[in-house]
């Protein structure tokens, strides 16, 4: 007989594990709505080129790619930002700016499965399109920080930030092609600094610039005053990147005033190739990987054929975030089992269940043909707190019996008093 199991790198989530995911989703959704964001749901399947165009080397190598019956090259989405950008061009380009969108969905990457890395996983994220101001960047970071604050993680996390515009501007100034820029940044992201510097040396042929690159790439934890000092260096002015350092200084100073924990890492690069300015990741001391990340991508929408539109966003790794939460208590409704003692009680069983479900109780109707002496301990062992028992005598008097399955306290009351009776027994 054939035995089917989950595909490698993918996982079933059942009961409390599924509820934890939905709980995180509800926290994120409520917060995003309070910040003025509207939900967007995009397809899991998109054209391969949508992601391949600016996804970066690593992403392209891990995509699930296939051809459909019309010979179109398609992909399961490895992330959601490009889908939102495509949907914006297709549906929202003429709408008033900025556009604020949030999403929650599964993504797929053919990575080697390991702790904190899956081939199917969930992302919760936002995108703000049509605003290039520092206020937009701060709003996005504030929302991200507040999400983790609601999970009681704000004292543990730190947001690592950098401005990838520093690297971009230098390479643009010396006419390094986009594909080569992408490769250099990929090497830096993988901590292959020497390889990246070798390529830069071959293309720039300028030792001073290579030395400057090396200098900033090794500044892993830069203080605010260091950024201000760097902005005043002669070589920074010569390379026309003073504004990029001053932006980082302004942003960092305001983040400090907002009591958001962060660190500046001038050697930090993210793997996705579309970032143009601010980049950031959320780190937690209990794991070796980031649990969320994002940045500014001011050229992606134009690259996709839309009008020039600055944009910024982030994605939260849902499963990764759950890994760092020690005690996530999901509030559950009271579990109620409704037991009828004869066929005549069936209509009353359903009527009682309807009443209780309207009041947010979790209600199950008993379908087992067993004596009450076996049913009550069984349902108590399954986590039910209350049993509603409807027998022949109760039915004749329009009464029900409410029993606390933990304390075994029970009372008989008229049907209309069922809610008060449950509260009395709990």
From Swiss-Prot:
GO molecular function: ATP binding; histidine-tRNA ligase activity
Protein's cellular compartments: Cytoplasm
Catalytic EC class: ligase
EC numbers for this chain: 6.1.1.21
InterPro entries the UniProt entry points to: aa-tRNA-synth_II (IPR006195), aa-tRNA-synth_II/BPL/LPL (IPR045864), Anticodon-bd (IPR004154), Anticodon-bd_dom_sf (IPR036621), His-tRNA-ligase (IPR015807), HisRS-like_core (IPR041715), HisRS/HisZ (IPR004516), HisZ (IPR004517)
One Gene Ontology term from the biological process aspect of the record: histidyl-tRNA aminoacylation
Keywords: Aminoacyl-tRNA synthetase, ATP-binding, Cytoplasm, Ligase, Nucleotide-binding, Protein biosynthesis
Pfam family, one: tRNA-synt_His
Main subcellular localisation: cytoplasm
Cellular compartments per GO CC: cytoplasm
Catalytic activity: tRNA(His) + L-histidine + ATP = L-histidyl-tRNA(His) + AMP + diphosphate + H(+)
Coiled coil: none
Similarity field: Belongs to the class-II aminoacyl-tRNA synthetase family.
NCBIfam families attached to this UniProt entry: hisS
Designated name of the protein: Histidine--tRNA ligase
Biological source species: Saccharolobus islandicus (strain M.16.27) (Sulfolobus islandicus)
Gene: hisS
């Amino acid at each position: 007989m054939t035995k089917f199991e989950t595909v490698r790198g993918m996982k079933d989530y059942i009961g409390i594990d599924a509820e934890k995911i939905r709980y995180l989703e509800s926290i994120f959704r409520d917060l995003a709505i309070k910040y003025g964001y509207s939900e967007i749901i995009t397809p899991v399947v998109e054209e391969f080129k949508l992601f391949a165009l600016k996804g970066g080397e690593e992403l392209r190598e891990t995509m699930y790619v296939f051809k459909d019956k019309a010979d179109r090259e398609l992909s399961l989405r490895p992330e959601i930002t490009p889908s939102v950008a495509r949907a914006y061009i297709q549906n929202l380009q003429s709408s008033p700016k900025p556009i604020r969108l949030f999403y929650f969905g599964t993504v797929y990457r053919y990575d080697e499965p390991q702790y904190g890395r899956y081939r199917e996983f969930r992302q919760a994220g936002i995108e703000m399109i049509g605003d290039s101001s520092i206020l937009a960047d701060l709003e996005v970071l504030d929302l991200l920080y507040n999400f983790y604050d609601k999970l009681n993680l704000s004292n543990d996390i730190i947001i690592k930030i950098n401005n990838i515009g520093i690297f971009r501007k230098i390479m643009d100034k010396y006419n390094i092609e986009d594909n080569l820029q992408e490769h250099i940044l990929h090497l830096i992201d993988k901590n292959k600094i020497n390889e990246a510097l070798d390529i830069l040396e071959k293309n720039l042929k300028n030792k001073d610039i290579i030395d400057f690159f090396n200098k900033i790439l090794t500044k892993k934890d830069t203080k605010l005053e260091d950024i201000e000092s760097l902005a005043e260096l002669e070589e920074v002015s010569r390379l026309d990147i003073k504004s990029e350092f001053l932006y980082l200084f302004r942003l960092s100073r305001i983040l400090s005033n907002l009591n958001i924990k962060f660190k500046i890492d001038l050697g930090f690069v993210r793997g996705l190739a579309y970032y143009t300015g601010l980049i950031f990741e959320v780190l937690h001391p209990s794991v070796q990987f980031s649990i969320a990340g994002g940045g500014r991508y001011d050229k992606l929408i134009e690259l996709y054929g839309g009008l020039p539109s600055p944009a910024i966003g982030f994605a939260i790794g849902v499963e990764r975030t759950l890994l760092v939460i020690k005690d996530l208590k999901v509030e559950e409704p009271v579990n109620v089992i409704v037991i009828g003692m004869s066929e005549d009680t069936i209509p009353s069983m359903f009527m009682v269940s309807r009443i209780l479900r309207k009041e947010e109780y979790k209600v199950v109707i008993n379908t087992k043909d067993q004596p009450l002496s076996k049913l009550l301990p069984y349902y108590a062992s399954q986590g039910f707190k209350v049993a509603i028992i409807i027998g022949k005598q109760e039915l004749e008097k329009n009464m029900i019996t409410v029993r606390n399955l933990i304390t075994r306290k029970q009372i008989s009351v008229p049907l209309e008093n069922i809610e008060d009776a449950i509260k009395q027994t709990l």
